[in-house]
Amino acid sequence: MEQNEFMEAIMYVNGVRRVLPDGLAHMTLLEYLRDLGLTGTKLGCGEGGCGSCTVMVSSYDRESKTCVHYAVNACLAPLYSVEGMHVISIEGVGHRKLGLHPLQESLASSHGSQCGFCTPGFVMSMYALLRSSKNSPSEEEIEECLAGNLCRCTGYRPIIDAFRVFAKSDDALYSGLSSLSLQDGSNICPSTGKPCSCGSKTTSEAATCNEDRFQSISYSDIDGAKYTDKELIFPPELLLRKLAPLKLGGNEGITWYRPVSLQNLLELKANFPDAKLLVGNTEVGIEMRLKRLQYPVLISAAQVPELNALNVNDNGIEVGSALRLSELLRLFRKVVKERPAHETSACKAFIEQLKWFAGTQIRNVACIGGNICTASPISDLNPLWMASRAEFRIINCNGDVRSIPAKDFFLGYRKVDMGSNEILLSVFLPWTRPLEYVKEFKQAHRRDDDIAIVNGGMRVFLEEKGQQLFVSDASIVYGGVAPLSLRARNTEELLIGKNWNKCLLQDALKVIQSDVLIKEGAPGGMVEFRKSLTLSFFFKFFLWVTHHVNNVNPTIETFPPSHMSAVQLVPRFSRIGKQDYETVKQGTSVGLPEVHLSARMQVTGEAEYTDDTPLPPCTLHAALVLSKVPHARILSVDDSAAKSSSGFVGLFLAKDVPGNNMIGPIVADEELFATDVVTCVGQVIGVLVADTHENAKTAARKVDVRYQELPAILSIKEAINAKSFHPNTERRLRKGDVELCFQSGQCDRIIEGEVQMGGQEHFYLEPNGSLVWTIDGGNEVHMISSTQAPQQHQKYVSHVLGLPMSKVVCKTKRLGGGFGGKETRSAFIAAAASVPSYLLNRPVKLILDRDVDMMITGHRHSFVGKYKVGFTNEGKILALDLEIYNNGGNSMDLSLSNLERAMFHSDNVYEIPHVRIVGNVCFTNFPSNTAFRGFGGPQGMLITENWIQRIAAELDKIPEEIKEMNFQVEGSITHYFQSLQHCTLHQLWKELKVSSNFLKTRREADEFNSHNRWKKRGVAMVPTKFGISFTTKFMNQAGALVHVYTDGTVLVTHGGVEMGQGLHTKVAQVAATAFNILLSSVFVSETSTDKVPNASPTAASASSDMYGAAVLDACEQIIARMEPVASKHNFNTFSELASACYFQRIDLSAHGFHIVPELEFDWVSGKGNAYRYYTYGAAFAEVEIDTLTGDFHTRKADIMLDLGYSLNPTIDIGQIEGAFVQGLGWVALEELKWGDAAHKWIKPGSLLTCGPGSYKIPSINDMPFQLNVSLLKGNPNAKAIHSSKAVGEPPFFLAASAFFAIKEAIKAARSEVGLTNWFPLETPATPERIRMACFDEFSAPFANSDFCPKLSV
């Protein structure tokens, strides 16, 4: 088969025709779009896991003669896979100059975009849903379509609110053919279902349709704003375009084939038996990118009609192997409505399983055959095919077809019964029979878009004999427990012929244990959990079948009603929330809920990030050469293979560094490039530059480094035992006399224990990156970096290049999220890129891939706390003795300051007369850990709340009673001797307790628990007191530069960085109020070291306080200069005043400066004012857990904070919601798994969870069903600008309310089996930890009641 020489390979992008040249078979759609300058589509992960690359693809379905619109991940889609299609990116939806689409305006005005990096992806997912909907989508459909999109900033609530309005619109406002035809009475474009005159033409005429490529749309107005009234139509040329075979080439000898008939495909398969067949590239793309596998021949089977065929008959359903999973889901939903209920039991099981399979973007392109033939041992669908009596139709290159039962198809790990000359043609699924039941099972870390830990498909066919039911046939299949989808053959044999009763259940549960054998140390870990799930799933299946057959035959032995909640499906509840705040307007803008200044740029994709910056001529691309072992001597570095790699320019090592190779934010204890010894996996050995990003990465992988391995320390415990601590990091705080208190008899009870908590990945959606270039012959170095600390970049680059700081400039426009992760570690990226840029005198761009970013840039510190607490029988706390350790990794970075804040916050909000705290920073052979929202404070408070819970358990009281009894009050003296002033803790706690209906909800939870054996609810309230300011005194300073122009507009530059937290917006509000002008007259452009020097990092939640005050200082200087002119004339506008001042030669520029007063702490005495003030807060949470699987959801969360007079209440509420959901990830979802003693199946020192496929941050489905936020009213804060308070970090810890609610629910479960004593629960409380803590007859065969799953700390 050869390419039709007369047929160009084309596509349309945003209505513009594009010819696709040969040679791009290696390229993804995302790379192509960004090369076109369409940078609104972002690269967030490169594996289809975050949704930031989402675009809409439209294609013409010749079978149905309709145009179909669907969202896809551009980062996985091969460029040639969209040949003959229309791709619409965010730029094609709407933009500021021509007008925003209603989706974009709604998202912006609803405060649904913070950092903005994920925003275009959300817009495109929703846009594709609207374009593909014949009727207005339901709220469930909206949330389902967003399941493949991640946001780290907002907590999702405002995004859902923004899009919810489209679920309420009239059906006629959507693009369905019938509704628009009825509405307009006009001709309908067959491609779009929208009015178009080409619809009245003949087919040949339509090809030359002269209608504009846009068509009018009619959506509900939102806020009366003006929107674009244009929608891109499907290009008429593509309607007539005949499908033709394609043969196109690519880099490294790749050839792309697209057959358009089964015969074409079989010919290709005969010629290239080892070729990779693909449809959506969702598996092959990952293999090529992450596993570095090479496939020289790729055959796209997507356009083969025979592989997309559907046939529904009296025997069942036959579907082609190339059918997309989203189409399969629609088909099953259709037949369930149309066929008798008893026939569709398997279809219903597939519907439920597909609903939680990946995200919408993946389901839209992934096909049935790919999922089957990949033969993944954790495939969600293969166990169901096997259990449902499905048959696979296989065709060889001669056209011979054979059938094989699905249950016999899988032979071993990634091995199937199919020869290299065969392909999967179709799948046949028979209808189920009366009394035949099929059920799906899956447990993952997260419900949405996650791979299974264990899954299953189960079927039983029953026959009635008298008053009893006997098993005629059965299939029990598990995934995630063996190298292949595993049939429990002995269990199946046991079941067949037996009476369906509880005795059979018990017998089957015993046999399953011998059918499913997982060895200790097996890949994937979680052995006890996985084994217990096999029993839990079967028990659920037995319950479910019994419930159904009882409706048919009421005489069948059944189970108590309290058991039946175990088989209820997890619904997609509509997420709702309330926001309660007062608006204290000050001047023209301060206090108002203004929209984020960049929101409308972000929703249109026009906002630029580091990777979007247009490249200077001759730019080189860099990749890092990284250590592959945790501790070793470097014997040699051989770059000979790299030199022969395509596009190679140079490799730069420590010997090439012009200045000093030793760097570090506080202590210069790190090498930029390792010289003799590496101390972690991922340590940078050198930087390689090439002509393209891909060529740089390819060449870097070819650099051969030889090592002599050395012993490694891979946990806090190992560090403690080896006394491996960073030098001079022991810290001590003391108040009262702990020993005397313990020995005096004052304490009725003394408890001792240990708290461990894992780390957390920042998972900012924008990876770290820098673009560095020289100017003036190399005399100056400039850079654009994704950083919270431009001054740090300036300092590092100056240091390693041997240049004065005055010749180095760092600029930052905005960040796609930071959360502390871009405070210090990002500076290493800029410094590494600066070396080749300086030496070669060429621009160098270094953007980290997601897996590299997660591996090398550090995380939230894991902690271990060892406590001893004395208290009275009433619950009054008397003494705390605490040893606290954090995992610093292989360098100091900010770990000491992190430890100090943890120690400061180890009282949380409690009055403790006698305190002794000793802290140490552990040296381990992991990449250096770093700042993360809360900066040690949450870890210190979590240790405290754990022993508070234990006191309550010891005294048989509810934890909230112990908390209230020990609250600090106005004037309390902390253990570091700072007096609490304006303490609003009691007030907000009392108000929250009432507004959340705490007592009523607790009673309702107890009632629910008494009636439900396998589902349990728990409630908890948690307070917080978070200190505001840097604990390093000199960092509490800020500068700003303000210019007033003669037209009355104002340009503000300050030292803070906008990373989604709304800093620029708040600062602009301060300036607008100061000058009594509208916010629209104030502009904040960027942060730059040549405008505001020596700026502190944007961190510690202090930026609004500091930079707002600095801007106000500058404004007041200008106002004072303007006053003589203003007092003499009555100016109508500020522009008139500014112009008059200009003519009077008055300086309209000012540099503002602010220092935070009253800060002084001495570690020698352990006394002083560590903080300027405190932000107080409290949260209530109600959760529900499935005790059989560990699955949980947060039913409700109520949060209240004291933020004084908020500068911008909606921005602050966005910070609260985002922090809470991020905190929910820390306490319950996100687990870093390292190669350590706890995970010996992982390569030592390596991070397994280095991408969204394995590391799960909260998705939309993980946010609380109801998320209510209120701000305490009437409490101005005299210690910050305009009586406000800091907000970024304080709410984070409040997610611990969900953690302790989970623990309460587990407590209720344990009480069912007589376990009433206190028990430990480590964070994160993943499904594994929840389930294994809920000890019962299904976990007992594998673990004791005190079993604690392994944790990397």
Curated annotation (Swiss-Prot):
Residue ranges of every copy of the 2Fe-2S ferredoxin-type domain listed in the record: 7-93
Catalytic EC class: oxidoreductase
Location of the active site: 1289
Gene Ontology MF term list: 2 iron, 2 sulfur cluster binding; FAD binding; iron ion binding; xanthine dehydrogenase activity
Cofactor binding note: Binds 2 [2Fe-2S] clusters. Binds 1 Mo-molybdopterin (Mo-MPT) cofactor per subunit.
GO (cellular component) term, any one: plasma membrane
Residue positions binding [2Fe-2S] cluster 2: 115, 118, 151, 153
Residues that bind FAD: 277-284, 357, 367-371, 380, 424, 442
Keyword line: 2Fe-2S, FAD, Flavoprotein, Iron, Iron-sulfur, Metal-binding, Molybdenum, NAD, Oxidoreductase
Record domain FAD-binding PCMH-type: where: 249-434
Names of the cofactor(s): [2Fe-2S] cluster; FAD; Mo-molybdopterin
EC assignment: 1.17.1.4
Binding site for Mo-molybdopterin: 788, 819, 933, 1100
UniProt-annotated binding residues for substrate: 823, 901, 935, 1031
Family that this chain belongs to: Belongs to the xanthine dehydrogenase family.
Annotated function: Key enzyme involved in purine catabolism. Catalyzes the oxidation of hypoxanthine to xanthine and the oxidation of xanthine to urate. Regulates the level of ureides and plays a role during plant growth and development and senescence.
Protein name: Xanthine dehydrogenase 2
